[in-house]
């Protein structure tokens, strides 16, 4: 494993953010969305923080930076800590209406993990690929960073409603107990989007093992949702972690599963390809993330009128 790259000089990051207009702000954070060339120093720092964060979670590629050939043509959503004057979190967004005409399916990061039959894109229509998420370790115990990043994603979708379907790979670290991983896979198998999953094939499939049958019985017997799954997983894990937070976020939005892949380049993480059609997401979730007026406009309905207290 190679040493982590040095931190990007703070003054360069401040210069980059000064050229951008935030999507929105809270007291502590500002949320920005920009192509790589609009803030040239930010992607490098995001790549450094991804490798730092992934290593801490038992993942990572062992390189100084987690930067790949997809960075130049993706959008970078990032969270800026105003008091800390540093990048606190990030997500990578790939709108397929922009990427597919220019690069075809190989221009999507997900295509390095899964084979997509051409009709998959015809069936699913315009989408927004999500991936490479991170929250800097110092901010991981706060609720706000991940929520603000999801608000940023839904803000983009509300401005580009043709990209109402989100999809991307969510990782389950090899640090999870084998029984925990087996329970997660067995539950997620019950959440497959049958019609579309048949059009996707993993490059390195997850293999059933001697635990699979027992896990399937456990899931069918008493585990009804991903929140219910978190408690037994937390009991199995030495650090008390439950189901991965991003899987829970997808499921709250009505997420469905498309397939599973093992990625040896990133410490054998298990990649779960997931999708969520925000047009079918619970209205309270959309209102919380987009705001009531934006959610109503996105869904093409009048805003709900709440009675005065």
Q: How would you describe each model-predicted region?
A:
Residues 1-37:
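Conserved N-terminal entry element of GNAT/NAT acetyltransferase domains
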Residues 22-89, 95:
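Short amphipathic alpha-helix that is part of the acyltransferase structural core
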Residues 28, 90, 127, 271:
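A residue-level signal for beta-strand positions that form part of recognition/binding surfaces
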Residues 33, 79, 93-95, 132, ...:
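Hydrophobic side chains in beta-strands
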Residues 41-42, 142, 282-286:
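Short, conserved charged micro-motifs
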Residues 51, 61, 97-256, 261-269, ...:
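Acyl-donor binding region in acyl/amide transferases
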Residues 73, 269-270:
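Short Asp/Glu-rich motifs
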Residues 271-309:
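C-terminal non-catalytic accessory extensions
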């Amino acid at each position: 494993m190679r040493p982590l790259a040095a931190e990007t000089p703070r003054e360069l990051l401040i210069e980059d953010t000064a050229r951008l207009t935030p999507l929105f702000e809270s007291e502590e954070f500002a949320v920005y969305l920009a192509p790589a060339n609009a803030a040239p120093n930010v992607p490098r720092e995001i790549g450094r923080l991804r490798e730092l964060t992934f290593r801490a979670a038992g993942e990572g590629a062992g390189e100084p930076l987690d930067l790949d050939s997809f960075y130049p043509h993706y959008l970078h959503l990032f969270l800026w800590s105003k008091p800390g004057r540093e990048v606190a979190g990030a997500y990578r967004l790939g709108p397929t209406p922009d990427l597919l005409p220019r690069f075809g399916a190989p221009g999507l990061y997900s295509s390095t993990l899964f084979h997509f039959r051409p009709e998959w894109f015809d069936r699913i229509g315009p989408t927004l690929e999500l991936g490479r998420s991170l929250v800097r370790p110092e901010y991981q115990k706060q609720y706000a960073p991940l929520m603000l990043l999801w608000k940023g994603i839904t803000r983009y979708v509300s401005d580009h409603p043709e990209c109402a379907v989100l999809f991307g790979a969510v990782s389950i670290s090899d640090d999870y107990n084998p029984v925990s991983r087996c329970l997660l896979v067995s539950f997620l198998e019950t959440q497959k989007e049958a019609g579309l999953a048949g059009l996707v094939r993993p490059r390195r499939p997850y293999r059933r093992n001697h635990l699979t049958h027992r896990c399937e019985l456990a899931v069918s017997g008493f585990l009804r949702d991903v929140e219910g799954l978190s408690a037994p997983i937390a009991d199995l894990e030495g650090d008390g972690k439950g189901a991965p937070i991003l899987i829970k976020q997808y499921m709250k939005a009505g997420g469905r599963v498309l397939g599973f892949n093992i990625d040896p380049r990133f410490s054998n993480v298990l990649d779960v390809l997931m999708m969520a059609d925000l047009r079918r997401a619970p209205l309270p979730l959309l209102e919380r993330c987009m705001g009531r007026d934006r959610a109503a406009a996105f869904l093409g309905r009048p805003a709900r009128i709440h009675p005065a207290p």
